[in-house]
C-alpha cells in the first residue's frame, strides 16, 4: 500500500531540494519588471517574459546599492537565488544584483539624475554667472599630482604671469571623492581673495569620472558664489558638473584660457594703442590751439586792444552818476522825515501823559488787591463750612460720642422695617463690635 504525504511534508521536501540545488543558489535571469510599487525599504515585484512570471524580492540593502530607480516595464538582468515559500508553496527569486538590460547601470543612473536635476532648474541659463575679464587669483579643485594642474599653471603663467593660482588638493575618483570635491568647492567659496574657480580632472572611464556626476558635487557648484569652469575628462566626456558649471572647457588648457580671457600681450598692446591715441589727440589739440592763436593775433582786438574795454568804461561812468543821484535823493528824504518827527515830539507833553498813566496803574493795583482779598476770605469761609458738615457725617466721630452703629450684611441698617426676626446684625461700638441675632421686631413711631 502506497504511503501518502501531507501537503506540509511535500512542501518541506521541495524546499530542501531548492535549498540544496547548486544551480538555484546563483541564478542569472532576464525579465521585465511588473507590478512594481516603490516601498520605503524592501521591494516586492514580478519578473516576466512572454511565457511566465516569477515573484521577485530585493532587500533594502541590495536596493540601495543599485544606483538607479526601478521602473515599471524596465527590462533587467538580475543575479539571485531561488527560494520556496512554504506556507503557499510558491517560489521566488531573491535578487542580489541588477542592472538594466542593454544599457549600463551608470548610464541609466546618469540619465535619471540628469532629468531630475534639469527639472529642478539646476542647469538653467538664468543661473549662470559671467566670467570676470580680469583675475588676480584663481582657485583650482583637482588632484595635486595629475597633468591637469600642470597644464593650468603653464597656460596661466604664459598668458598672464601676474595671476596667482591656489590649489585645493582633491581626491578625484573612488570612494569619498565626490564628498571631497564638494567640500573643497565650499572651502574655496569661503575665501575673499579668489576671483574664479576651476574644477576638473583628466580623462578616464565613466566609473573614473563618476564623482563629478554625484548630486552633492552638482549642488556645490550650483551654490558657488565664485564663477566655476568645469574641465572634466576629455572633449568627448560629459558629466553633470559640466551642465551646472558656468562654463565648460574641453581641456585644462582651455579652462586656463577661459580664466584669463585677456592676456598680458593684450594689455601691453592696449596700453600702446592708448598711448598712440593720446599722443595723436595732444597733437590735434596743439595744432587747433595754434590756429586759434594765429587767428586772434590778426584780429582787430589785438591790433587795437583799447577797444576791448571801451564799452565797460562807458557803462561804469553811467552807473557812478546814477548812484550819486540816488544817494542825494535818499539823504534829502531822510532829512525831511527827521524834521517832521521833531515837530510832532515838540507838540506833545510827554511828562504829563506819563504821570496820568502812573496814577491809573496805582489805582488798578489797589482794586485788584482788594478784590483778591475778598474772594480769598469768601472761599475760606465756604471751605470751613463744608469741612464742618463732612466731619458731622463721620461715623467714627459719632461712635466716639457714645453712639453705636447697626449693620446688616455689611451695610448700615437705618430702619426697623428693614430688619426681621432671625436676622444677624453687627453692632459697631467705640471699643469693639457685637454680633447679635434679632429675637423680636417692634415698629414704633418716634
Swiss-Prot record:
A GO biological-process term: DNA catabolic process
Family annotation (CDD domains): ExoVII_LU_OBF
Annotated compartments: Cytoplasm
Reactions the enzyme catalyzes: Exonucleolytic cleavage in either 5'- to 3'- or 3'- to 5'-direction to yield nucleoside 5'-phosphates
InterPro entries the UniProt entry points to: Exonuc_VII_L (IPR003753), Exonuc_VII_lsu_C (IPR020579), OB-fold_nuc-bd_dom (IPR025824)
Pfam families, sorted: Exonuc_VII_L, tRNA_anti_2
EC number: 3.1.11.6
Any one GO cellular component localisation term in the record: cytoplasm
GO molecular function, one term: nucleic acid binding
Keywords, alphabetical: Cytoplasm, Exonuclease, Hydrolase, Nuclease
Function in brief: Bidirectionally degrades single-stranded DNA into large acid-insoluble oligonucleotides, which are then degraded further into small acid-soluble oligonucleotides.
Family membership noted in the UniProt record: Belongs to the XseA family.
Subunit annotation: Heterooligomer composed of large and small subunits.
PANTHER family with a match to the protein in the record: EXODEOXYRIBONUCLEASE 7 LARGE SUBUNIT (PTHR30008:SF0)
Protein name as it appears in the record: Exodeoxyribonuclease 7 large subunit
Organism: Streptococcus equi subsp. zooepidemicus (strain MGCS10565)
Amino acid at each position: 500500500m502506497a504511503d501518502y504525504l501531507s501537503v506540509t511534508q511535500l512542501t518541506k521536501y521541495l524546499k530542501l531540494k531548492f535549498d540544496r540545488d547548486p544551480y538555484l543558489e546563483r541564478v542569472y535571469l532576464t525579465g521585465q519588471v511588473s507590478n512594481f510599487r516603490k516601498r520605503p525599504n524592501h521591494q516586492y515585484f514580478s519578473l516576466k517574459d512572454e511565457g511566465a512570471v516569477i515573484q521577485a524580492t530585493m532587500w533594502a540593502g541590495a536596493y540601495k546599492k543599485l544606483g538607479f530607480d526601478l521602473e515599471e516595464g524596465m527590462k533587467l538582468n538580475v543575479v539571485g537565488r531561488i527560494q520556496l515559500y512554504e506556507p503557499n508553496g510558491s517560489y521566488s527569486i531573491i535578487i542580489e544584483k541588477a542592472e538594466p538590460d542593454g544599457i549600463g547601470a551608470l548610464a541609466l543612473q546618469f540619465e535619471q539624475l540628469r532629468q531630475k536635476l534639469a527639472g529642478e532648474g539646476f542647469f538653467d541659463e538664468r543661473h549662470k554667472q559671467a566670467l570676470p575679464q580680469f583675475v588676480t587669483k584663481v582657485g583650482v579643485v583637482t588632484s595635486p599630482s595629475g597633468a591637469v594642474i600642470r597644464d593650468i599653471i603653464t597656460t596661466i603663467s604664459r598668458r598672464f604671469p601676474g595671476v596667482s593660482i591656489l590649489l585645493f588638493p582633491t581626491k578625484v575618483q573612488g570612494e569619498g571623492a565626490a564628498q571631497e570635491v564638494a567640500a573643497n568647492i565650499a572651502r574655496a567659496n569661503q575665501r575673499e581673495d579668489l576671483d574664479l574657480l576651476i574644477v576638473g580632472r583628466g580623462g578616464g572611464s565613466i566609473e573614473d569620472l563618476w564623482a563629478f556626476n554625484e548630486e552633492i558635487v552638482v549642488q556645490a557648484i550650483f551654490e558657488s558664489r565664485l564663477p566655476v569652469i568645469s574641465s572634466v575628462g576629455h572633449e568627448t566626456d560629459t558629466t553633470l558638473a559640466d551642465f551646472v558649471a558656468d562654463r565648460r572647457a574641453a581641456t585644462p588648457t582651455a579652462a586656463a584660457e577661459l580664466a584669463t580671457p585677456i592676456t598680458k600681450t593684450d594689455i601691453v598692446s592696449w596700453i600702446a594703442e592708448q598711448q598712440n591715441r593720446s599722443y595723436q589727440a595732444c597733437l590735434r589739440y596743439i595744432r587747433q590751439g595754434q590756429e586759434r592763436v594765429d587767428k586772434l593775433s590778426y584780429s582787430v582786438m589785438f591790433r587795437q586792444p583799447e577797444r576791448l574795454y571801451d564799452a565797460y568804461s562807458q557803462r561804469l561812468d553811467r552807473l557812478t552818476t546814477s548812484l550819486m543821484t540816488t544817494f542825494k535823493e535818499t539823504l534829502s528824504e531822510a532829512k525831511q522825515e527827521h524834521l517832521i518827527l521833531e515837530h510832532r515830539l515838540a507838540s506833545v507833553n510827554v511828562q504829563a501823559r506819563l504821570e496820568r498813566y502812573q496814577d491809573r496803574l496805582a489805582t488798578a493795583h489797589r482794586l485788584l488787591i482788594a478784590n483778591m482779598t475778598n474772594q480769598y476770605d469768601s472761599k475760606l469761609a465756604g471751605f470751613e463750612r463744608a469741612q464742618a458738615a463732612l466731619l458731622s457725617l463721620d461715623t467714627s466721630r459719632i461712635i466716639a460720642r457714645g453712639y453705636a452703629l447697626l449693620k446688616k450684611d455689611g451695610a448700615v441698617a437705618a430702619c426697623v422695617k428693614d430688619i426681621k426676626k432671625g436676622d444677624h446684625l453687627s453692632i459697631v461700638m467705640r471699643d469693639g463690635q457685637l454680633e447679635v441675632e434679632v429675637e423680636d421686631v417692634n415698629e414704633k413711631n418716634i
